[in-house]
């Protein structure tokens, strides 16, 4: 299968290159960006020498359609919404890593503060959390966000089984700096990040409606959640710490059983006896989940960790590609966590 990447110079686009280089069923045939056009990717990023020597091209939808069988959009929010229409009209498959096709138009505009994609285009897309969405044969995939992936995988088994008081959910989520993308900002300057820890977008992070929307598919009465996001002084990784109260007569063993039922046959979710750490998933497509119960407060704490650029973006995108095509779900994704 031949694929193209739009948004090659961003972190997620570069991670896609590395993954696809080891994918037995995929050939990367073109890469596109608005910067460094005409230069070889390996000249711009020497660590990719011998991995990808393709020249960066301007975006041209028709040329991509002629060369490839599918396109990945690894672009900032607000880009894919304006570029995807030509592909949809041509019935040409898309996996969009941005948030542009995850939410209804009015919700997207409220939370992203950008013009949404046309409703007829949005209706074509399937929001695809790999462990829960049947995407075989689908053509247009909205890849979940990084915070959303970690949080949803932690909560869905408990919400679906009716084990927790859904109005008690509080999520304290933390991300490494790459989660904010490559665009420079005050919060991304080294001197502001190093030896520092800060909360940002409190109550206003754009992944909040995505998480609630997904959980409501498992419990229609699911209310809003309290969700905070903070910036860790690390390069990559997300830790979502979820607090919730158990319903009456629910035992800790019921929680363990719910996670086992949900994930025992899922190759990229590991339910751990010990509490998860970022180092154990960095550089991989794994999600590690652990939990602990406080009998005095009746609060269950669930911790979910992922690599935001892999399971939270490019890794899950390739996982969805594999599932779309009916291939082995793990193809191209046999990355051992780097740990250090």
Swiss-Prot record:
GO terms for molecular function: N-acetyl-gamma-glutamyl-phosphate reductase activity; NAD binding; NADP+ binding. Pathway: Amino-acid biosynthesis; L-arginine biosynthesis; N(2)-acetyl-L-ornithine from L-glutamate: step 3/4. It holds the Pfam family Semialdhyde_dhC_1. The keyword Repressor does not apply. Disulfide bonds: none annotated. Keywords: Amino-acid biosynthesis, Arginine biosynthesis, Cytoplasm, NADP, Oxidoreductase. GO terms for biological process: L-arginine biosynthetic process. It is found in: Cytoplasm. HAMAP family: ArgC_type1. Catalyzes the NADPH-dependent reduction of N-acetyl-5-glutamyl phosphate to yield N-acetyl-L-glutamate 5-semialdehyde. NCBIfam families: argC. This is N-acetyl-gamma-glutamyl-phosphate reductase. It comes from Streptococcus thermophilus (strain ATCC BAA-491 / LMD-9).
């Amino acid at each position: 299968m031949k694929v193209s990447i739009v948004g090659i110079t961003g972190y997620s686009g570069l991670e896609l290159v590395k993954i696809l280089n080891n994918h037995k069923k995929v050939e990367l045939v073109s890469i596109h960006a608005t910067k460094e056009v005409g230069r070889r990717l390996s000249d711009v990023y020497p660590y990719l020498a011998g991995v990808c020597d393709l020249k960066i091209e301007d975006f041209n939808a028709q040329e991509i359609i002629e060369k490839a069988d599918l396109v990945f959009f690894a672009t900032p929010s607000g880009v894919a919404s304006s570029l995807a229409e030509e592909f949809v009209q041509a019935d040409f498959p898309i996996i969009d890593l941005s948030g542009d096709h995850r939410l209804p138009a009015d919700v997207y505009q409220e939370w992203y503060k950008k013009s949404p994609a046309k409703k007829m285009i949005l209706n074509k897309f399937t929001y695809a959390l790999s462990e829960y969405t049947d995407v075989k044969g689908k053509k247009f995939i909205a890849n979940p966000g990084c915070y959303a992936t970690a949080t949803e995988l932690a909560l869905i088994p408990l919400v679906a089984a009716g084990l927790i008081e859904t109005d008690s959910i509080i999520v304290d989520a933390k991300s490494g700096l790459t989660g904010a993308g490559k665009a420079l900002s005050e919060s991304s300057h080294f001197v502001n990040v190093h030896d520092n820890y800060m909360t940002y977008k409190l109550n206003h992070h754009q992944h909040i409606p995505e998480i609630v929307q997904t959980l409501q598919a498992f419990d229609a009465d699911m209310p809003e959640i309290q969700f905070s996001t903070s910036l860790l002084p690390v390069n990559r990784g997300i830790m979502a710490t979820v607090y919730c109260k158990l319903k009456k007569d629910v035992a800790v063993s019921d929680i363990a059983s719910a996670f086992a039922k949900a994930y025992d046959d899922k190759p990229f979710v590991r339910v751990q006896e010990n509490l998860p750490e970022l180092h154990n998933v960095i550089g991989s497509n794994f999600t590690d989940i652990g939990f602990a119960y406080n009998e005095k407060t009746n609060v269950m704490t669930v911790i979910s960790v992922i690599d935001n650029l892999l399971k939270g973006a490019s890794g899950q995108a390739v996982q969805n590609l594999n599932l779309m095509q009916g291939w082995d779900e793990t193809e191209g994704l046999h990355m051992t966590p780097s740990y250090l």
